[in-house]
Amino acid sequence: KQKTAYEIRLSLVGSEMCIRDRIYTTAGSRRAVVSLDAKTGEILWTHSIDEGERGQYAPRQLSGRGLAHWESDSTGEEQIIYVTPGYRMMALDAVTGNPVASFGDNGIVDLKQDADQQIDLITGEIGLHSTPIVAKDVVIVGAAHRTGGNPKSRENVKGYVRGFNVHTGERLWIFHTIPLPGEYGNESWLNESSAYTGNTGVWAQISVDLDLETVYLPVEAATGDYYGAYRPGDNLFSESLVAVDLNTGERKWHYQLVHHGIWDHDIPCAPILADVVIDGQLRKIVAQPTKQAFLYVFDRVSGEPIWPIEERGVELGDVPGEWYSPTQPHPTKPPPYDRQGVSEEDLINFTPELRAKGIEVASWHKMGPIFTPPVVSSIDGPLGTLMAPATGGGTNWPGGAYDPENNMVYVVSNSSVTSLAVVPPYPGQSDMAYIQGSALSGPRTSGGAGSVSYTHLTLPTKRIV
């Protein structure tokens, strides 16, 4: 029987990383970096900084989800790179834990600066809780914001993506997830709404194909999550998978998975890169799990869908001032790996009494297929739109993985239902006409609370619990 060699107790721990005989992780409310001896568990060094008010205003606090490692091919120099809660990128010597003096300002790059926008260094609501990614000599950093259902303002910080030199911390490139005037995609923001709209960060993990020198960016929704009247248009590159050049940040291709999102369908996890034989041909693919339980699969060189993605008509809502897209993308393969939308047939049916109660509760709400829009909540009904998967997915940041031996993609999915509605804000709460209303969750449905799903890339989707 295998015995436990040692146990280390750390509070608020991020994902651990083992490099040879050392373990690195983040821990604690200040996101300290900790280095451990992998054999004994001895703490070799720790590093943290006190960010004062800036850390207190940070939208993504605590330990975060981990850190990155870089090693020089020529000198063997090793660095640990991470982003603090206050949105500073730090490079530490992997052996000593000391800041790397040649990187930025004595080991620190202030990510609130040189960002092609004005960001208040103390109160600017932008940060990152996922890890930066190092590819060759480029460090790529995304951005995260506060949860966007109840924004204080229609104006917010933009979540641009940047690449930095791993040796010096110099900014190499920036990709504007909300295009500037004259850039591709700016025309998808009507009424000059690109000027003040924010968010569209990449808070999920980023993937890189080193051979193709291509970075795959899973982009979140724009301000606000459920009410988009102040940003009419399709809103590129919100809720899009974007491929950019590793060395320059220039867009190679993109595919928008949700037009003018009003459902908080951020792309929540790392794109999955795989080389797969499809119809007798070896294809380099990128597969993107989503909150809406669709697996979108593309040729990762060209961006062309491996199987057709149809633009299907969806219901247009009646929230005052809202702009609606008449269609939304629906993959034809693979099939959805979790429940989409809610109908009376989905309600709980363990006993006749529970079934009747489920129908009664559901009658207070609007029901329909995926992409049924939110409503203005009313005490006279409907209270909200029953949404499945809920705003947390489907799939969320744990994402999925590819098994090359069995040609399977495995994803974790949450089968929960939520009631989605908007309401006028309280005086002084927001300058938006409507924000998210969250009085109650949706009714229980049959089929359980979640599943692990697997998709054979040439066969139907299956679910395993």
List where the protein language model places each region.
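Extracytoplasmic/lumenal domain signature
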Residues: 33-57, 74, 89-123, 154, ...
